[in-house]
Amino acid sequence: MIYVSLTTIPERIKDSNRSIDSLLNQSLKPDKIFINIPLKYKRFKEVIDDEQIPEFNDNKVEITRCEDCGPGTKLLGSLDKLERNSLIILADDDNIYENYMIEKFYHYYSLAPENAYSFYVHPLGNFGIGQGADGFAINTNSLDGIKKFYDKVVKDYKELFLYDDLWI
């Protein structure tokens, strides 16, 4: 399975269809696109009502109402719906993606599924931190324990809560 997962916030919901359309128009189609929308936000007073969510005439798009985990909602909101040994690509709601994004990620994933991939990686010593805005791809098998890690370490640590690139 190939999943794409993202989240949105109140100020960006009305324009999120541009990003979703770019994901639906990929040369290699995803099996499912999750849009994870918190029922209420920790960072904003506003909420997104169901009526504000754009309709997508494609059964590949699934809206998931969930807890606000900051930008990490893009992953954690759909985590329990993912099959093992699948590719998940994390995306942002304010980017329009090149139509080859999924195809490129899948190509490299098929060569080495134990690795994570991003189109831009920040070097940090002997490590690299993938920038999620450009897309971040990982095997779902690598996500064991990430929700527990979020609950124990990230949830109450503002700097991590707001910067999912550091902990996903």
What are these regions (language model features)?
Residues S19-D31, L39-K40, P54-E55:
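Short, acidic, metal-binding catalytic loop of nucleotide-sugar glycosyltransferases
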Residues L160-W167:
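Acidic donor-binding loop at a coil-to-helix junction in glycosyltransferase catalytic cores
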Residues M1-N25, F34:
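N-proximal low-complexity "stem/linker" segments adjacent to membrane-targeting elements
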Residues N99-L124:
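Conserved donor-nucleotide/metal-binding helix-loop-beta segment in metal-dependent transferases, i.e.
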Residues I2, L24-I35, N59-V61, S86:
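Short loop->beta transition adjacent to catalytic acidic/histidine clusters or analogous donor-positioning motifs
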Residues N36-S86:
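Active-site-proximal specificity loops/subdomain of glycosyltransferases
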Residues I129-D151:
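Conserved nucleotide-sugar donor-binding
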Residues N85-I96:
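Short beta-strand-to-loop acidic/aromatic patch adjacent to the donor-nucleotide binding site
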